[in-house]
A protein has these predicted regions:
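Conserved catalytic cores of phosphodiester-cleaving nucleases, focusing on short active-site segments
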Residues: 9-15
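Non-catalytic C-terminal interaction segments of nucleic acid-processing enzymes
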Residues: 1-7, 19-132
Length: 132
């Protein structure tokens, strides 16, 4: 969080597409309540440590190319267990973005997500200190 501005800034980090699939799937009611709570903040972000490609290709993306090559039957069985599709995840995220004004940023990995988060904090810190 940004010291002194915890009341106006909220950054929610998501480590994997599986995490967000769980949030908008099995835990949707809880996650919707969390989005309602986040809506009270002036500046709100969901920082994703994965790509838009991961969302679009979910659930196929959860297995590496090597895994698909060496154990295709296993991959297919595991994917068949999933009830959530990438299309559904994308729809849910775009609804949160549209309805609650939450900025959703796809950063590809944890390192990039950290850099993006730091950059957001720097911009907000500059803005807040110019206003005081």
């Amino acid at each position: 969080t940004l010291e002194g501005f915890e009341e106006v800034v909220c950054i929610e980090r998501k480590k994997s597409v599986e995490e967000i699939a769980n949030n908008v799937g099995k835990e949707k009611k809880r996650f919707d309540a969390e989005m309602e709570r986040i809506n009270e903040y002036t500046f709100k972000y969901i920082i994703c440590e994965f790509s838009m490609d991961d969302i679009i290709n979910y659930p196929r993306c959860i297995f590496s190319e090597n895994m698909w090559h060496t154990k295709p039957e296993f991959c297919e069985r595991e994917i068949a267990k999933r009830k959530i599709t990438g299309k559904y995840i994308l729809r849910a995220l775009m609804e949160y973005q549209t309805w609650y004004g939450i900025h959703i940023l796809f950063c590809d990995n944890a390192k990039n997500a950290k850099k993006v988060t730091e950059s957001i904090f720097k911009r907000l810190n500059t803005m807040f200190h110019e206003q005081t």
